[in-house]
Curated annotation (Swiss-Prot):
GO terms for molecular function: proton-transporting ATP synthase activity, rotational mechanism. In plastids the F-type ATPase is also known as CF(1)CF(0). The keyword Transmembrane applies. Belongs to the ATPase B chain family. This is ATP synthase subunit b, chloroplastic. It comes from Vaucheria litorea. It is a single-pass membrane protein. The keyword Hydrolase does not apply. F(1)F(0) ATP synthase produces ATP from ADP in the presence of a proton or sodium gradient. F-type ATPases consist of two structural domains, F(1) containing the extramembraneous catalytic core and F(0) containing the membrane proton channel, linked together by a central stalk and a peripheral stalk. During catalysis, ATP synthesis in the catalytic domain of F(1) is coupled via a rotary mechanism of the central stalk subunits to proton translocation.
Length: 178
């Protein structure tokens, strides 16, 4: 027991008490005890940090999957709008051809101008809807790509932040990290 106490505390000839700062020269048992104590006090901190990091990663993955599903739904809606626009365009083309045949028999010049103007307006409307659908798809794909890139860039930074926090905690507990 005396050796046990003397490995931590040195009693000099003047009878003064001080801590033995050279732990590596004391013995292997003290080193093992020190490691056990450090592990005991730091395991809760490490477990909390790792579990919170895991929760963050899982929530980020879930959010990304939700955004991808939303983007897929929007893509399906945009494709449906596109097909409806194509059907409407075909119907308009058929109607225009029928109207042109009728116009040859009646007042050709006036009705032709009105019909052409109407057809151009419809084409402009369809073109606008087509561009709007394309821009929506492009925007969603760009947002998803940027979010994935940002998530990939932030992941290593967050791991470095975790190591800085752990090193600071070790220094607060009086540990020496070399």
């Amino acid at each position: 027991m005396k050796n046990w106490i003397s490995s931590f505390i040195l009693v000099h000839q003047e009878k003064s008490i001080s801590f033995n700062t050279n732990i590596l020269e004391t013995n292997l048992i003290n080193i093992i005890i020190l490691l056990i104590i450090l592990f005991y006090f730091l395991k809760g901190l490490l477990k909390d940090n790792l579990s919170s990091r895991q929760e963050n990663i899982l929530s980020t993955i879930q959010n990304s999957e939700n955004r991808i599903n939303e983007a897929n739904e929007r893509l399906v809606d945009a494709k449906l709008q596109w097909s409806q626009a194509q059907i409407t365009l075909e119907e308009l083309k058929n109607q225009t051809l029928q109207n042109k045949l009728i116009l040859f028999n009646a007042e050709f010049e006036i009705k032709n101008q009105v019909l052409s103007q109407h057809f151009n307006n419809l084409l402009m409307t369809l073109y606008y809807r087509e561009q709007q659908a394309f821009n929506n798809i492009k925007k969603q794909v760009s947002e998803l790509a940027l979010k994935k890139v940002i998530a990939k860039l932030q992941a290593p930074l967050m791991e470095e932040d975790q190591s800085v926090i752990i090193i600071n905690k070790i220094h607060r507990l009086g540990g020496n990290l070399e």
